[in-house]
Regions:
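Acyl-donor (CoA/ACP) binding surface of acyl/acetyltransferases
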Residues: 1-8, 13, 40, 44-149
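Conserved GNAT-fold acetyl-CoA-binding loop/helix
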Residues: 10-31
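Short loop/turn motifs at secondary-structure junctions and domain boundaries
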Residues: 32-37
Length: 149
């Protein structure tokens, strides 16, 4: 995680966490955020045993719809990998019994919205959210949802 994305300013720009300064921050983040998640996946390349990103159910939105969040190492942006990963996770979450799934992105990161649209998600609203954990700064987000087919 640290080598591939948590220390990268380009990746952290649109995430709710600041770039990690050293591996101990990533270790803390992993222990306190990711490992407790009931639905959490690492993204890897076929035949490789190194994570290049992740997808998690990060909570519920204000109307009780579970939301996913995702991240990918910068060198893999724009190659269709996140769309493939999100499609697989949505399929698995629906298989597990979820009826509706949501996702949101910072309006300054329209590529993330394109991933959501390619995965069949529909725009539902704009909202405001904390830009970074531990900050009072807000950012505008676009929210999408998809219902079980």
């Amino acid at each position: 995680m640290f080598r591939n994305w948590t220390q990268d300013d380009r990746v952290a720009r649109y995430c709710r966490w600041y770039p990690h300064k050293d591996i101990s921050e990533t270790e803390w983040f992993l222990k306190n955020c990711c490992l407790g998640a009931e639905y959490s996946w690492a993204i890897t390349l076929i035949g490789k045993d190194e994570p290049i990103g992740g997808i998690d159910v990060v909570g519920e939105n204000d109307v009780g719809v579970p939301e996913i969040g995702y991240v990918l190492a910068h060198e893999y942006w724009g190659k269709g990998l996140m769309t493939e990963a999100v499609q697989a996770v949505l399929k698995e979450l629906f298989r597990c019994g979820f009826e509706k799934i949501g996702a949101c992105h910072d309006i300054n990161n329209p590529a993330s919205g394109k991933v959501m649209e390619k995965c069949g998600m529909t725009y539902v609203r704009k909202s405001m959210a904390l830009k970074k954990f531990g900050s009072d700064e807000q950012c505008e987000i676009k929210c999408y949802e998809i219902s079980r087919p």
